[in-house]
Amino acid sequence: MTLIHFSFCSAFILGLTGLALNRSPILSILLCLEGMLLMSMDGIVLTPLHLTIYLSSMMLYIMLPFAAPEAATGLSLNSDHYTTHGTDKLFSLNLLEC
C-alpha cells in the first residue's frame, strides 16, 4: 500500500469515526458523509492509475452525479430545519411531522 492509498484510507476511516462519534449536529453528519464520499471518489480515480485498469474509472462517472445533489439537498434541508426549529441537533428532527 502506497502512502497515497494509506492517506485516502485513513481519511475515509477518520470520516467514518467522525460520523460515529458526532451524531448530534446535522451539519457534522453531512460534513463527515461528504468527506467519506470525496475520499471514496479519490480512491476510485487513483486505483486505475496504479493498476492500469481503465474500466473501473467509469465508476467515477456513476458516483459523481450523486455527490453534488446530496450536498446541496442536505445543506438546504439543514438551513430550513434551523430556521423553523432554531437548532440543528438531530434529536429535534421529528420524522412523523414530515
UniProtKB/Swiss-Prot annotation:
It catalyses: a ubiquinone + NADH + 5 H(+)(in) = a ubiquinol + NAD(+) + 4 H(+)(out). GO terms for molecular function: NADH dehydrogenase (ubiquinone) activity. GO terms for cellular component: mitochondrial inner membrane; respiratory chain complex I. Its EC number is 7.1.1.2. The chain crosses the membrane at residues 1-21, 48-68. InterPro entries: NUOK/Mnh_C1-like. It is found in: Mitochondrion inner membrane. Keywords: Electron transport, Membrane, Mitochondrion, Mitochondrion inner membrane, NAD, Respiratory chain, Translocase, Transmembrane, Transmembrane helix, Transport, Ubiquinone. The keyword S-adenosyl-L-methionine does not apply. It is a multi-pass membrane protein. The keyword Transport applies. Core subunit of the mitochondrial membrane respiratory chain NADH dehydrogenase (Complex I) which catalyzes electron transfer from NADH through the respiratory chain, using ubiquinone as an electron acceptor. Part of the enzyme membrane arm which is embedded in the lipid bilayer and involved in proton translocation. Core subunit of respiratory chain NADH dehydrogenase (Complex I) which is composed of 45 different subunits. Belongs to the complex I subunit 4L family. This is NADH-ubiquinone oxidoreductase chain 4L.
